[in-house]
């Protein structure tokens, strides 16, 4: 016979699935892929084609923000998690503490280099130009969250 304790004990919830744990990143990735496919089929000279090209850069920025802010750090930013512990090498500690900026700067240089070598008026040249702009905005926002505050945000609570 079951006791009252047995009847009131809730079963342990099952572990969250991969899809549940990563649904935001996967959702953003699905949107980027959908936009790339739509852009490949659209005429970039039309409003709709132009929209798809611009949206690729915007949503790639969302994807990078979701994924990279989960795994990388930016010391001094209230919006970023802070690294635990300290590394022995001051150089490695600096790179880890600013790994989000390091990643964004390196990939920004890559996008800028690619853009410089492309025809800016070509289909993908416009998209890559928008990606350079998007990366500049993300990097600027990361740095601004280290210095500036906004009432009601995490920075404003400092």
Positions of predicted regions on the chain:
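Alpha-helical transmembrane segments
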Residues: 23-27, 59-63, 99-103, 135
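N-terminal membrane topogenic signal
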Residues: 14-25, 93-99
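Short, charged juxtamembrane terminal tails flanking transmembrane helices
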Residues: 3, 156-158
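Transmembrane alpha-helical segments of multi-pass membrane proteins
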Residues: 88-107
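Short, Lys/Arg-rich, polar N-terminal cytosolic tail immediately upstream
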Residues: 1-17
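Membrane-helix interface/capping segments
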Residues: 73-87
């Amino acid at each position: 016979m079951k006791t009252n304790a047995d009847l009131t004990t809730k079963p342990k919830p099952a572990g969250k699935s991969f899809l549940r744990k990563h649904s935001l990143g996967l959702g953003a990735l699905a949107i980027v892929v959908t936009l790339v496919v739509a852009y490949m089929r659209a005429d970039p000279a039309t409003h709709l084609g132009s929209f798809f090209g611009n949206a690729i850069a915007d949503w790639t920025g969302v994807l990078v923000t979701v994924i990279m802010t989960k795994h990388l750090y930016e010391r001094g930013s209230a919006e970023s998690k802070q690294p635990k512990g300290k590394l022995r090498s001051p150089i490695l500690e600096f790179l880890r503490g600013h790994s989000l900026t390091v990643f964004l700067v390196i990939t920004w240089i890559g996008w800028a280099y690619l853009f410089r070598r492309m025809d800016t008026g070509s289909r993908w040249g416009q998209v890559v130009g928008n990606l350079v702009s998007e990366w500049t905005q993300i990097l600027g926002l990361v740095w601004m969250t280290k210095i500036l505050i906004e009432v009601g945000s995490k920075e404003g609570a400092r």
